[in-house]
Amino acid sequence: VSFSSSYGIQEIIKRPDLLNGEQYRQVHEAARLNYLSDIQAGILPAPTSGSAAGLALKTPMANTGVNTNWLDYVLRTGAITNNQFSFSSGGENSKIYFSVSNISQEGIIKQDKYDVSRVRLNVEQKITNKLKFGVNSYFTYLDSVPIVDDNNTYQPYSNAINAAPNLAPYGEDGKPNRNLTSNNPLWAFERVVSDRYQTIGSNIYAVYNPIKNLTLKSSVSGSIMSRRYNRFDAPNTRRGEQAGKPWGYGYYSTNNNREYLIENTANYNKEFVDGRLVVDVLAGQSFQRWEYEDSYVQGENFPSNDLKWLVSAGTINAGRSYFMAMSLASFFGRAQFTWDNKYNLMVSTRYDGSSKFAKGNKWGNFPAVSAGWTVS
């Protein structure tokens, strides 16, 4: 029996030293004066009257008295816990292994969350001196709240770096301020996101040795993965507004993947000439199938922040469902010869058939020959 548990915290290693509100205004004013100087010197053309550049040129940036460190609104101290438990037992005829684990993490970006639990069970039983059975199975459950717009220039951290420090994070209505020169980093935290995975899989096998040096093995394995992803921009939020009025947007998707593999092999391994020649011959058959299924629906015009599911949407404006399946059947063989642990010769072939290809082109043969010499 084994058990371990740990807890840790996470901080950003090198936090950027950003300008405060007054420093930002001073830099802007210096740039404005340099721009005017270049125009007067004929280096740059004057901007069109009434354009954004023209208005900015005429008007110095106001001293708002606001000093916002946007990173304070985006970052936090992250935390991670890790718990592991395992049990193993067995002897000559039977073996068992069981484990359960959980990793829970809150990232340094606010609302970022990751929680995964795993269970594994391996059992092997020797029936006779020639026959044994085994089962390897597992289950995984993942629940996460991903960073909104992750891997995107508009994700919270990037926006916090770009946002002007002389502007307030919230407006008079208590919502994230929209009067910024870039996206408000706080808009990301208005979105409700849920992403969940479940995976279950197992491998059942039997190994039989009818005579010395000959091993027959049959196995059946499979896995099922399902995912549910949901996001909601509530109507009474900046993200959920339309033309400044409450509206709301929702999106829901599911993914289901199934896979199974059947494999049968016969392996013969024998030494000749007082062990100088080793012959290893393998022949087998396998069949594998994959199935992929996904769908999504999105809608808008929600009556309330509390009604988050698409059944409450006033309009369903998009949707799709998709299914794909493919199979691969194989027959294979391999013969390997080794002399004095120094000279090696291998001959192999595969005869594969795939459902991906058109009728008359589904099957192909793939022979191979290789030779080797072990230097030392």
Language-model features and meaning:
Residues V1-S2, I80-N82, K95, I103-E106:
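A beta-strand signature from Gram-negative outer-membrane beta-barrel systems
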Residues F85, L121, S202-I204, N264-A266, ...:
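Membrane-embedded beta-strands of outer-membrane beta-barrel proteins
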Residues S219, R334-T338, S348:
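Exposed, low-structure sequence patches enriched in small/polar residues
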Residues I80, G91-E92, T128-K130, N209-I211, ...:
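Outer-membrane beta-barrel channels and translocator barrels
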